[in-house]
Amino acid sequence: MNIVGKITGITYKVLLTEDLKKVEIKNFDINQMPSSCLLTDNKNSFAISKWVSPKRTRSYPFERVFNTLNISKKITVIPIVKDEGGKGDRDFIQWDTVSLMSLLDVFVIFAYYTEAEKADLKIINQQFDNKYVYSKIKEIEQYHSSALHWNLNELNTNLHNIIDKVKTSYADIEKTTGVKLHNANGLDNFKDKIGKDVSLFMAFSRGKAEKAQSREFVTFQPKESLSTLSKAKVTITNYLGGQYFLTVDEILLTKDKVSLIEGKHSKNAILPRISINKFL
C-alpha cells in the first residue's frame, strides 16, 4: 500500500524536549558544544543543533532539531558530505532534508569537515570548520527574512563553493591521516548533478529517496515484533516543494482513520530510547 498525503499548513505542540544548556557565543566551538544548546550574547539568543551526518536515518538528528523547536530562532548545522573512508560510507545531503528544516522554520548552515582521526581503514572524530560555522551564525544573527529564504539562498549561491571546500579539506585529511577516502570524482558528480538550480537538486535527491523507500519497503527487521504484515509506503508532499518518501512498519485501518505503527527494538534496554521516537 502507498499512503499519500499533503501538508497544507503546520501546527504542533512541543513535548518531551530536553533543557538546553546555555553557551555564550564568545565561547562558541561547534565541535565542543552539545548536540543541541542555547547560544546567547548580550542582545540575542537562539537555539542551535548539529548533525553528525547528512543522512537522516543515522544518529537520530531529528531529535536534536526537535529539542530546539520551542525557541523562536533555530539553527541547525549539517555537513553536506561525510566521507568515512574508502572502506566506509559516504553520505550526501538531500533536498528534502533542507525542505523539512524550512517547513519547521529552521535555518540551515551547510558545513564541512576539516580535521579527522585515523581508525584502521576509516576516519573518525571529524571536526567542522569552526570559523566558517561561526561566521554563518553571525550572518544569521543579522538576518531578518525567513529560514526558507535563507536556506534557498544558501543552496543557490553557496553550495558549489562549499563542495569545493569539501574537496580540498578531504584531500588534506587523506594526506594527514593516510586513510584512502572515496574518489573525489563523486564530489564533482554531485556538484554537476545538483547544478546551480534548486530544481535540479530537488530532482536528483528525489530519485535517490524514492529508490531508498523501495528498498526499505521490502526489508523486514526480525527483531521487531509486528502483529501484521502490513508494511506500507508513505509519500508526503508539502507546500514548499518538499516530498518525503517514507515507510511505516504497520498500518491499522478503522473506518475513516489510518493508524501508522512503527516498530523499534533495543539490544540491551527494555524499551528503545525516547530519542528514537521524538520525531516519528
Predicted regions: what is each one?
Residues 1-196:
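Terminal, charged accessory segments of proteins
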Residues 14, 109-115, 203, 219-222, ...:
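Intrinsically disordered, low-complexity regions enriched in small/polar residues
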Residues 181-223:
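Solvent-exposed, charged helical/coil patches
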Residues 212-280:
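Catalytic core segments in nucleotide and nucleic-acid processing enzymes
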